[in-house]
Amino acid sequence: MTDDAAEVAVVGSYNVGLTMMVPRFPTGGETVIGRDFAEGPGGKGSNQAIAASRLGAESSFIGNIGTDRYGDEAVDLWESEQVDVTNVRRSDDSHTGVGFVIVNEEGENEITVAPGANNALNSNVIRSARPTIEASDCLLAQLEV
């Protein structure tokens, strides 16, 4: 980063996407055999923080994750992408957010999200991040948490 890099603060969610391809969506009570399973990081806020960093901004993420494997992987990802994690809170009471995505052969998807620790993002968390927010040139929020 350069001294004149923009500072971007992102308030948002982190979710792990668990994605499976299916020939068609199941109907109620039906099991459909899928293929091509993938697991990967996501969440609109997290994605924005990483994108800002990759574009040369000094990027900070403000959000909540669990104290589980997915939360550990999130911190590792952000640190490898040079996203500041000072304002990331870890929850012992809830899991890191996950999204279950099924995609049919036409490319349409159905998504179910278990937000977990994302739901603990509240005004107290935002107030504690105030110095980061005030120092930023840009604040991004997606209204999803």
Where are the language model's segments positioned?
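Short, glycine-/polar-rich solvent-exposed loops and beta-turns at beta-strand/coil boundaries
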Residues: 92-94
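Ribokinase/PfkB-type carbohydrate-kinase core domain
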Residues: 1-14, 64, 72, 76-90, ...
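Short alpha-helix plus adjacent loop in nuclease-associated cores
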Residues: 96-99
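Glycine-rich phosphate/adenosyl-contacting loop at the front of the ribokinase-like
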Residues: 1-64, 69-76, 80-83
